[in-house]
Amino acid sequence: MLELNEKIKGHFRNPQNVGEIENPEGMGAINNPVCGDTTKLYLKIKNGVVEDAKFLFFGCAVTVASASVFTQKIRGKEISKLFLGTDEEVVRRLVNLTESELGEIPPIKLHCPPATVEVFLESIAGYLGKEGKIELRSRAKSLIPKISEYYKRGEEKE
């Protein structure tokens, strides 16, 4: 049986921010190609700041816990500040939003947290496109594959 830490179990049993946002400024969906988990993310953005974030899911405990933590941590964040620095710095900043809270994730489940960050970038890219911020939108889209690459490098170190 897969052993999960108490933080992951807690977020799975009582996930935060589950639901939809009516008329979201940003929305994205992802189907994890590794396991089939699905996450949909909705963002309410005002003056370039994430005011609210909610998600719907069909997935395992780690997928749910990742989205629960991420939607809590992303609130109040200024979008432009999230993208300051090199691609590696931006990826690390976004990954840290869940990693620091969830603790150790079983190696067999390391494919779950990247999906949450990827769906966030997809949601933000949609918002930035509507706002006419094409350069920042392109950067958000270009970071999506780098999230999984980041996690794969971590797996190789173990």
Task: Write out the residue ranges for each language-model feature.
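C-terminal binding/interaction regions
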Residues: M1-E22, G28, K77-S80, L84-E158
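Structured beta-strand/loop patches that form or line metal/cofactor-binding pockets in enzymes
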Residues: G10, V18-N47, K54
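Short, thiol/selenol-centered motifs that function as redox-active sites or metal-ligating centers
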Residues: C35, F57-S66
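Helix-adjacent hinge/juxtasegments
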Residues: L43, E51-A53, F70-Q72, K81
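Glycine/charged-rich beta-loop-alpha catalytic/anionic-binding loops adjacent to active sites
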Residues: K44-F55, R93-L102
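Alpha-helical support elements that line or immediately flank enzyme active sites
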Residues: V62-S80
